[in-house]
Amino acid sequence: IAKMEMICEKLQLERGMKVLEIGCGWGALARWMSQRYGVSVTGITVSKEQAKLARSRCAGLPVSIELADYRALNGEYDRIVSVGMLEHVGQKNYRTYFAKARSLLKDQGLFLLHTIGAGRGGFATDRWIEKYIFPNGVLPPADALAKTAGEFFTIEDWHNFGADYDPTLMAWYENFNRSWVDLKTSYSDRFKRMFDYYLLVSAGSFRSRENHLWQLVLSADGIAGGYRPSRWSASAQ
């Protein structure tokens, strides 16, 4: 809830706005934005399972969940948000991604991009995580992200709160192990070892500051008078 509320504050949502969510997942953010802020939301995903559940969660709200590729979209939106999707775009497609987002955003609109980022070593791909958790996932380094985003947008704000991801992942690890007594009839011990390893290695990568968690707020041509960012820690709520 804290993460969703921080996103909404940074987007400076107003009732009646049209919002596009690129990579809407299971529909939680789309529902939150619509219920709390009175905006209409178009959410897109390439997963049939996600689309089905998201539509169920958002039933009765001005939310449209579409099974679509972002490259095929048309229209114009006051706000765009994309959470945890850039990691799956691929570095060769960054220009296409940002160019399409710019074409969909109104001139005075805002685009919030939420992504895990790599440290100083350049684009990061872990072979084990790619095989078992996130196929074809790539983490962008800051310089590549700034260069490509900056071709199409003004970077109004760049928030790094990766240190907060460490306690989040540890909480997931504890919840997973606490629930294992109910889950073990459906999953193997091998799966448990795999997921334990994933959660702990990921927590370590953020604790060591090897990986980062970024939220960028982008505008089309710069906000007149400047953008006033929301600054609070999601882990503190």
Task: Indicate residue ranges for each PLM-predicted region.
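Conserved SAM-binding loop
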Residues: 54-55
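Conserved class I S-adenosyl-L-methionine
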Residues: 16-23
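Substrate-binding/catalytic lobe of Class I Rossmann-like enzymes that use SAM or dcSAM, i.e.
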Residues: 116-225, 234
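A short glycine-rich, Lys/Arg-flanked "PGG" loop and its adjoining helix->strand segment in the class I
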Residues: 95-107
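Conserved beta-strand signature within the Rossmann-like core of class I S-adenosyl-L-methionine
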Residues: 108-116
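A short acidic, Gly/Pro-enriched loop at the edge of an enzyme's catalytic core
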Residues: 71-80
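Conserved SAM-binding loop of SAM-dependent methyltransferases across substrates and taxa
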Residues: 26-37
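Conserved SAM-binding strand-loop segment of SAM-dependent methyltransferases
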Residues: 60-70
